[in-house]
């Protein structure tokens, strides 16, 4: 009676291990993507909550947030500053300006990771994949007339009415803010639910 494995038996075992590793790698990739999307979702929800609290406290929107008709405002260093000053978001400040990792405003988790990696050398024109750091700044729309409805929020160029005081959205890892109707199925994150856009009059 022989002891040990034959070459065929070893190849079968190696093949089984390879299949299991391939399956595990695919599952791991899905878990990582879901975790990234969840972090982004939490960021937009927290930012919308902070904006709503700021409005409720002051009874009006700060001038830095009332750009144009406030249907697509970048939460850049100027627009994010009122949130930092009011203490609603823990953003780094120095001499009344955003500083450190927060010096560009509120950015996606991928933008934040890039800024931390590059440190002081980071700039808005830096590439993250095929897009720039500028593309990773969060966007918001505001209810300017106080009726609880944001009329005509421009989400990826698509006009959307939303039942909310403040709505915040963010691109996915690709740096592209999709049209709202297609972004729901992709990697973009929104502070509101689909139901908040239905039957708005």
What are the functions of these language-model segments?
Residues 20, 30-49, 55-61, 65:
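Extracellular/surface-associated beta-sandwich interaction domains
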Residues 37-38, 45, 49-52, 125-201:
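Short, surface-exposed interaction loops/tails
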Residues 1-31, 36:
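N-terminal single-pass transmembrane signal-anchor helix
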Residues 51-110, 124:
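Short, glycine/small-hydrophobic-rich surface segments
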Residues 108, 112-113, 119, 132:
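Glycine-rich, aromatic-lined ligand/substrate-binding cores of catalytic
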Residues 40, 84-87, 165-166:
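Extended low-polarity, hydrophobic cluster-rich segments
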Residues 2, 57, 109, 144-146, ...:
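Short, ordered coil/turn segments that flank beta-strands lining enzyme active or ligand-binding pockets
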